UniProtKB/Swiss-Prot annotation:
Changing residue 76 to A: In strain: ATCC 21705. Keywords: Antibiotic biosynthesis, Transferase. Pfam families: PEP_mutase. InterPro entries: CPEP_Pphonmut, ICL/PEPM, Isocitrate_lyase_ph_CS, Pyrv/PenolPyrv_kinase-like_dom, Pyrv_kinase-like_dom_sf. This is Carboxyvinyl-carboxyphosphonate phosphorylmutase.
């Protein structure tokens, strides 16, 4: 029997080496991540909200909007894809329905958080949490809904800021008991907190590396030495894209050309190389084989 992508992802997550999963916000960024050699892709919730809606990470995206972006990403890469499922889009039955929809789109897992819906970015102020009991109900609904037992359910808690680290650890243990396969404890403040979480939670751990966020910005080797199993980078791609685009189009408005921008940056990609990101040669070959003129 062939090994599924869900099984492959689980094996990577549980391997001795940390699994580094950059975050895509659309099909193009997912393609680039795969071509850079990473074994999996994470679909960022904040980047999806920004790229699809032009709105901040405050719970604006719906299940259907997430599924559209997911489908485009899953169809364009061959590696396993996981996603940010926010707070589950409602109650436990909303989680049940979302799990079915997302799994059938083709992802191998997601992370689900214990914030009140609509949620807020984990590194912003003003987060409100649901009860432990409500969250464990959501996790149990997700476990029931998944069709492949290897589909990975990552439980995120934002309790560190609201209630302290002790409560965040307590909740994390409850979430593991409810069936979570991995724990994502958001917004830890220093390395000592990260080490304590590793010591006190008997489950794989996800590290959320956010530029300018509250958690220390560590290298993958440093995270691995602490004992983290998985690292995601939800802002990196779309923050870089927004920064570069702003500089590029400011140059165009002020100078009337983009030439100086490319000269300063050093043109790293030719026109031909750009098209090969999308496998132009392969698609052209298929077109030549299959597209025939009508008589």
């Amino acid at each position: 029997m062939a090994v599924t992508k869900a099984r492959t992802f689980r094996e990577l997550m549980n391997a001795p080496e940390i699994l580094v999963v950059p975050s895509a916000y659309d099909a193009l960024s997912a393609k680039v991540i795969q071509q850079a050699g990473f074994p999996a892709v994470h679909m960022t919730g904040s980047g999806t909200s920004a790229s699809m809606l032009g709105l901040p990470d405050l719970g604006f995206t719906s299940v259907s909007e997430q599924a559209i972006n997911l489908k485009n990403i899953v169809l364009t890469v061959d590696v396993p894809v996981i996603m940010d499922a926010d707070a589950g889009y409602g109650n436990a039955m909303s989680v049940w329905r979302a799990t079915r929809e997302f799994e059938r789109v083709g992802i191998v897992g997601y992370h689900l958080e214990d914030q009140v819906n609509p949620k807020r970015c984990g590194h912003l102020e003003g987060k409100r949490l649901i009860s432990t009991e409500e969250m464990t109900g959501k996790i149990e609904a997700a476990v029931e809904a998944r069709e492949d037992e290897d589909f990975t359910i990552i439980a995120r808690t934002d309790a560190r800021e609201s209630f302290g680290l002790d409560e965040a650890i307590r909740r994390s243990r409850e979430y593991v008991a409810a069936g979570a396969d991995c724990i994502f404890l958001e917004a830890m403040l220093d390395v000592e907190e990260m080490k304590r979480v590793r010591d006190e939670i008997d489950a794989p751990l996800l590290a959320n590396m956010v530029e300018g966020g509250k958690t220390p910005w560590l290298t993958t080797k440093e995270l691995e030495s602490i004992g983290y199993n998985l690292a995601i980078y939800p802002l990196s791609g779309w923050m870089a894209a927004a920064s570069v685009l702003r500089k590029l189009f400011t140059e165009l408005r002020e100078a009337g050309t983009t030439q100086k921008f490319w000269d300063d940056m050093g043109l790293k990609m030719s026109f031909a190389e750009l098209f090969e990101v999308f496998e132009y040669s392969k698609i052209s070959e298929l077109e030549a084989r299959f597209v025939r003129d009508q008589d």
